[in-house]
């Protein structure tokens, strides 16, 4: 088991990474709580909820609630339902919420914790590769039908407990989804990791190699978060690939593609725009081939959908005064945020579409 620490403006919190940690969560929670409220989804709960409960001999002060798996669960309805469950089960300001699951569970449970009685403690127990990113940094949110993660807060957990044994049961689309965020972190701040990934197929990566990638990705995320917790400056760089990625998620429908698969396509687009904006050459074709080789869906769109995509990108949280703010690369490990008006974005989307049609 390894321990890392993230220093936030509010406090510092530990990240524990190891095997079998789900059986002994109580060992990593020093504070005594009046109630524990475990929030999970139907897929994760059916596999791992009993393992977590095994670590608590008395279930007297433990309650749990299961939501449907999938992005559509990050909704106002589920948020309200969980607040009601917390109240009916007697949670108070000295209770703890445990988010057992992937990014959807972590985002939703974190927002419930941030707002219940004006904020109570919660811990993240991520069970996906993707959640190595979302569980660190304290960004919690639910979706609105007009866009992704538009209702949320910055509210760091008191701990992240990452049992990497749970990653062994992930389906292929969730594996692809998680590695997209690791690719993003490599492009932003770890070229060695990025190039190493391009040299491997996902099927060939062994558990010990995955653990190395996860730790490196978490280090990238934590270093940035420690400098800019509330995304006033450099934390925006962690949104590389997300401007188009979130828009693609919306037009394709939440749950029809994974977040990471959408971000992977957004990364390609970000490299394309960067090459045109800065007149440079980036590993666009290498990344495209790696995505194809690892069976990522290459998402297309029509000329008619470009206007819709632009409007969705303008609802992105980075946008200022209706102007799209997009994270680009001057080179690998050198991210920058630029402003793009509608005509510039339309041109970039059109040239990207033409480029992709030739591949």
Swiss-Prot record:
Binding site for NAD(+): 69-74, 103-107, 127-128, 139, 148, 166-169
Cofactors demanded by this protein: NAD(+); Co(2+); Zn(2+)
Pathway(s) served: Metabolic intermediate biosynthesis; chorismate biosynthesis; chorismate from D-erythrose 4-phosphate and phosphoenolpyruvate: step 2/7
SUPFAM superfamilies registered for this protein in UniProt: Dehydroquinate synthase-like
Subcellular location: Cytoplasm
Enzyme class at the top of the EC tree: lyase
Keywords, sorted A to Z: Amino-acid biosynthesis, Aromatic amino acid biosynthesis, Cobalt, Cytoplasm, Lyase, Metal-binding, NAD, Nucleotide-binding, Zinc
Domain of life: Bacteria
Binding site for Zn(2+): 181, 242, 259
Cofactor info, note text: Binds 1 divalent metal cation per subunit. Can use either Co(2+) or Zn(2+).
Record-listed E.C. numbers: 4.2.3.4
UniProt family annotation: Belongs to the sugar phosphate cyclases superfamily. Dehydroquinate synthase family.
HAMAP family: DHQ_synthase (MF_00110)
Function recorded in the entry: Catalyzes the conversion of 3-deoxy-D-arabino-heptulosonate 7-phosphate (DAHP) to dehydroquinate (DHQ).
Protein known as: 3-dehydroquinate synthase
Gene this protein is translated from: aroB
